[in-house]
Structure formats: structure tokens, C-alpha cells
Swiss-Prot record:
Keywords: Decarboxylase, Flavoprotein, FMN, Isoprene biosynthesis, Lyase, Manganese, Metal-binding. Belongs to the UbiD family. It catalyses: (2E)-3-methyl-5-phosphooxypent-2-enoate + H(+) = isopentenyl phosphate + CO2. GO terms for biological process: isoprenoid biosynthetic process. It holds the Pfam family UbiD_C. It comes from Methanocaldococcus jannaschii (strain ATCC 43067 / DSM 2661 / JAL-1 / JCM 10045 / NBRC 100440) (Methanococcus jannaschii). This is Anhydromevalonate phosphate decarboxylase. GO terms for cellular component: cytoplasm. The keyword Ligase does not apply. Mn(2+) binds at residues 131, 194.
Length: 421
């Protein structure tokens, strides 16, 4: 963790309070790495993951990161777990009640309490193997409450475990390499091993060690070992990716059995609704959308989920247009690949999809509203969109074909250039 922090040359802050103090700083410097020397006696880091910082950490160009992830996903089965139980000797073991001493922030004024937001949840199933995922986790006295989205993999494995033995063994790792964060944020088939995927992102291998409950975990600054129980408690309100409050629900309780921390650990605070949150939610979805669009429009070049769309609701798709209709086909394929998408813009390969002004230029000069806009009413949308029909999870989806008309000819849209010499 320290090596990564030093590589990013963070903004250094001397001290902050864990109640609103950490979040004020992370909000002020949103998108820029921040290192706080003292929060309740611990070091804290935040704003670690953005497109720019991840490109620096993995030494991959921003526009090529989607292909880097796609390549690692295809090599997931080749990822190796290097078991080194001596890693466990680095940790101080604490009682469950000591979690109140950890620098876990309260981020916003209406939050239900202190929340773990960067914790990667590790579980194992004998039929499906290891599963990694990121969930918001509310701290309540000496136990936790986890927001578990229905019908996602963890929810399925949790219900399976309840039927088999009445609980699900769990580990929560905090302060991990961004490869583990990306792996935990990736949506794939339930048989996809996110630990091996993290290994693939790191070049083929990742060090792990075994906890007392038998789970293999990657090295982290803080670790919580416990059980997810059938009992539930109130979870929320809490701020989600759109910067608005999510509702209160009854969610599963995690019984803390053991706490681990390094001698001088660094806590990773992830600001809800901040750029880091959006990046980790969105970037791992982009390879999946690219693959889906490629099946329909093989000449797709790149895809980005935009920050303005919370890296979840808006996509810009870049294609090399070969025939009329490619743009609309790409729109439909993108919606099918990521059902949470609300608006999709398809552009030509001369448009820089990472420059929103260039995307807007394509809309201004290549779109006729009565011909190039697709509206789909009553489609399944995202529960994170406060404007949608939240009860039925329905929304209107809009696709904009901002590609050049081949009937008019590309020369009609030629952009003027100034020679280098």
C-alpha cells in the first residue's frame, strides 16, 4: 500500500476527524490521491482510484485500460494463488469490540453511522469457488450490517449457505492492491474466480494466506473475519453513486469473530459518490459492454462510462462505421450488455470519447433528432437512478446515433486540420 501511495504523490494532510472530516477532505480533492497522517491515531488514504491513477499504477494508457482488463479477464483461469501463511505473522489480532477504534468514517450528514466502503468481501463455495465483491458495510457496536443486492452472486451464495449450514463464512479485506478492488468490482459469470482475475491483473500471481475460518485472502491493511448470519437489521440511509441517499432496508448481520491489522496500517476511505466510487463501479463494466457490442458491431473501437453519468448510467461507444444502421445496432447492443444504462451515445472513430466536448461536437454536427435518436420506454433500469420508477425498476432509455451519415459521405463532415510543418 505504501509503495502505491508514494507512486501517486498524494496531497498530504496532517489530521482529520473520522466524522465528516475525512469526507470533507476527500470531497475537496475529489479525483486526487490524498494521504492523511492522523485519523483517530491511524493513517488514512483516499481517492486512490481514478482513470489517471489506475493508468499510472498499472502502467497502461488510459484509453487502453479497457483492453488491459479484457485481456486479464480472458486469462483468469491462468491466474495463480501463491499461498504464503507467513504473511499472517504481519498482523495484530484484536477483539471484535476494537472495531470502534478503527478510523472508519461517517461520510454524510444523514448516514446511518460509520461505513466501511472500500472493503472487499471474500467468500468461498465448494461448488462455485471464490467470490470477491464490494459492498457498503455499516458498523453497529460489535457487529456489522451488509448491503447485499438481491440476485447478485453474494446474495445467491449467502442463501445457498444458509440452507446448507445456517451462515456464510466471510472475510472483509480493507487496504488492498487496486487489482483486488477492480476484481471485486467486476461483473462476470458466477464461476469466474475474482482472486485469479486479480492475479492476472498483477501479471499472473497474487500472494494469499489462510485465515482461521479457512478462507484465503490477499494481503491487506485491515481484515475482518466473521460470519454472515440469517438475522437482519436496519441498513441505511446511505449515499450511493449518484450522490443521493438510498433507502433504509433490512439487511444481513455480520458477526465479527476476529479482527486483524498491521502494526502501522493505512485505512482506505472511499468517498461515496466520489470519482473513486464511480471509477470502481464503472471501469470493470466496460470490457463486458465492449464484448457485447463487438458481437453485433465488430468494428467497435472503444467504450467509456462517463463520470457525468456516474460511470454507470451513460456510455459513449466509439465505432468505425461501415454501414448505415451500425450506430443504432451498437446502441441496442450496449443496452443489452449493461441493463443499468440509461443513455448511450455512439460516435465515429475520429471522436475522442474521453473528451466530453468532442462528444458534444458529434451530437451538434452529426445528429438529426427525428432520425438519429432511439427512445425505449418501460425498460428495466437501474435502482440507482432517482428519476426512474423505483418500485418496478423501470426507466426510459435514450440512444443517440452521433455518427456521420454514409449517404452524405464522410467528406461532408471532414474536420479541418493544420499541417505539423
Amino acid at each position: 500500500m505504501r509503495e502505491i501511495i508514494n507512486k501517486l504523490n498524494p496531497i498530504i494532510i496532517d489530521k482529520a476527524d473520522k466524522k465528516f472530516g475525512v469526507s470533507r477532505i476527500l470531497k475537496k480533492y475529489d479525483g486526487k490521491p490524498v494521504y492523511i497522517k492522523d485519523v483517530n491515531g491511524f493513517e488514512v488514504v483516499g481517492n486512490l482510484c481514478s482513470r489517471e491513477t489506475l493508468s499510472k499504477i498499472f502502467n497502461v494508457k488510459k484509453e487502453d485500460f479497457i483492453f488491459f482488463m479484457l485481456d486479464a479477464m480472458e486469462k483468469e483461469k491462468e491466474g495463480k494463488l501463491k499461498i504464503n501463511n507467513k504473511l499472517k505473522e504481519k498482523y495484530i489480532v484484536e477483539i471484535p469490540e476494537n472495531i470502534k477504534n478503527w478510523p472508519i468514517p461517517i461520510y454524510y450528514e444523514k448516514d446511518a453511522g460509520a461505513y466501511i466502503t472500500s472493503g472487499v468481501v471474500v467468500v468461498y463455495d465448494k461448488d462455485y469457488g471464490y467470490n470477491l465483491s464490494i459492498h457498503r458495510i455499516l458498523v453497529k457496536d460489535d457487529y456489522l450490517v451488509i448491503r447485499m443486492v438481491e440476485q447478485r452472486h453474494l446474495h445467491f451464495l449467502y442463501n445457498k449457505a444458509l440452507k446448507e449450514k445456517g451462515y456464510l463464512d466471510v472475510a472483509i479485506v480493507i487496504g488492498v492492491h487496486p487489482a483486488v478492488l477492480l476484481a471485486g468490482s467486476t461483473s462476470a459469470d458466477i464461476t469466474f474466480d475474482e482472486l485469479k482475475f486479480a492475479a492476472a491483473l498483477l501479471g499472473g500471481e497474487i500472494g494469499v494466506f489462510e485465515l482461521d475460518n479457512g478462507l484465503l485472502v490477499p494481503e491487506a491493511e485491515f481484515i475482518i473475519e466473521g460470519k454472515i448470519l440469517p438475522e437482519v437489521d436496519d441498513e441505511g440511509p446511505f449515499v450511493d453513486i449518484t450522490g443521493t441517499y438510498d433507502i433504509v432496508r433490512k439487511q444481513p448481520i455480520i458477526k465479527i469473530e476476529k479482527l486483524y491489522r498491521k502494526e502501522k496500517p493505512i485505512f482506505h476511505a472511499l468517498l461515496p459518490g466520489g470519482i473513486e466510487h464511480k471509477t470502481l463501479m464503472g471501469m470493470p463494466q466496460e470490457p463486458r459492454i465492449l464484448k457485447g457490442v463487438r458481437n453485433t458491431v465488430p468494428t467497435v473501437k472503444n467504450i467509456v462510462l462517463t463520470e457525468g453519468g456516474c460511470c454507470w448510467l451513460h456510455a459513449v461507444v466509439q465505432i468505425e462505421k461501415r454501414t448505415e444502421g451500425d450506430g443504432k445496432n451498437a446502441i441496442l447492443a450496449a443496452f443489452a450488455s449493461h441493463p443499468s444504462l440509461k443513455h448511450v451515445i455512439v460516435v465515429d472513430d475520429d471522436i475522442n470519447i474521453f473528451d466530453i466536448n468532442d462528444v458534444e461536437y458529434a451530437i451538434a454536427t452529426r445528429v438529426q433528432g427525428d432520425k438519429d435518436i432511439v427512445i425505449i420506454s418501460g425498460a428495466k433500469g437501474s435502482s440507482l437512478d432517482p428519476s426512474s420508477d423505483l418500485k418496478n425498476k423501470l426507466t426510459a432509455k435514450v440512444g443517440v446515433d452521433a455518427t456521420m451519415s454514409l449517404i452524405k459521405g464522410r467528406e461532408h463532415f471532414e474536420r479541418a486540420k493544420i499541417p505539423d510543418k
